């Protein structure tokens, strides 16, 4: 891959991320402009979009990593299957404009979150049972403890989207607080969690490329700004939301730019993409960076919802 090709790929990735961030919240912007009903449905659909992107990331990642592990444990077949079901449910929800939840979709997403939580426990057990127990070496080279958590987030976003559809249009509530505020806090916490996993793996890689600092700086700041915008008093709300929205669009673009960087990492390995069957497993994980974009899209939807509440 030549230097020119890499630059073009990076620009295309950033453009794709920005376009997806704007596209995902178009229903919310239209609802706000026309004052039409259904703002909470538009937010629910945006959360479905984020859930779908996370499920796709988990599907690709778990299928590759568990295949590399030769599916030694039969339970290793479960995450790809559940992620595929979650992806289907999220895509169906993203296309559904009805202000009513779907029981099957809701059940699938709850099942996905439960499967992700169980997988996190299994991965932590795998790390602690290795010689040396809980150590940096085992965290680096054992089963990635944060990987199944993406399935938890996908299920949570999808389940919240279904619950939001059943809330009244004039005053939707989640977890005992205004829906926009609750959605922003959930998305912000998800961004901080995914940034922590990226920090661990990039620390393992000794931050050998300056771009490896981006996920551990841009993404946590996005999560903090989102939480601040959710909790800010009314007199500071507009400014906080505007700055957080700008930063979240940058975060969404970063996810796709990271995909380009990881693809470049695979290309630079011995044999490049011609030796894809080995380098895809040995190189940086391609499905990981889009999880930032998924949570940024959810955060943008939450901010739009929060603005209508104020």
Kindly give the residue locations of the regions a language model identified.
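Short amphipathic, positively biased membrane-proximal segments
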Residues: 1-310
């Amino acid at each position: 891959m030549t230097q020119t090709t890499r630059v073009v790929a990076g620009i295309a990735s950033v453009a794709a991320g920005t376009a997806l961030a704007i596209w995902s919240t178009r229903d919310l912007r239209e609802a706000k402009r026309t004052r039409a009903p259904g703002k909470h449905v538009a937010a629910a659909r945006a959360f479905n979009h984020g859930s779908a992107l996370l499920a796709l990331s988990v599907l690709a990642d778990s299928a590759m990593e568990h295949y590399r592990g030769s599916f030694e444990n039969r339970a290793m077949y479960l995450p790809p299957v559940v992620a595929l079901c979650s992806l289907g449910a999220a895509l169906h929800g993203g296309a559904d404009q009805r202000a009513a939840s779907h029981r099957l979709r809701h059940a699938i997403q709850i099942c996905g979150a439960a499967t992700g939580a169980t997988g996190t426990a299994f991965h932590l057990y795998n790390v602690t049972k290795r010689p040396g127990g809980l150590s940096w070496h085992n965290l680096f080279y054992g089963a990635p403890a944060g990987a199944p958590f993406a399935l938890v987030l996908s299920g949570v976003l999808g389940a919240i989207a279904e619950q939001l559809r059943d809330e009244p249009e004039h005053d939707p509530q989640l977890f005992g607080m205004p829906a926009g505020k609750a959605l922003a806090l959930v998305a912000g916490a998800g961004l901080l969690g995914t940034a922590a996993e990226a920090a661990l793996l990039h620390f393992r890689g000794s931050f050998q490329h300056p771009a490896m600092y981006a996920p551990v700086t841009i993404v946590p700041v996005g999560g903090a700004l989102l939480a601040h915008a959710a909790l800010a008093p009314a007199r500071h709300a507009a400014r906080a939301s505007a700055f957080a929205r700008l930063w979240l669009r940058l975060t969404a673009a970063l996810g796709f730019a990271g995909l380009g960087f990881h693809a470049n990492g695979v290309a630079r390995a011995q044999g490049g993409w011609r030796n894809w069957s080995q380098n895809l497993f040995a190189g940086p994980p391609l499905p990981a960076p889009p999880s930032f974009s998924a949570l940024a899209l959810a955060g943008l939807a939450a901010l739009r919802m929060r603005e209508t509440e104020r």
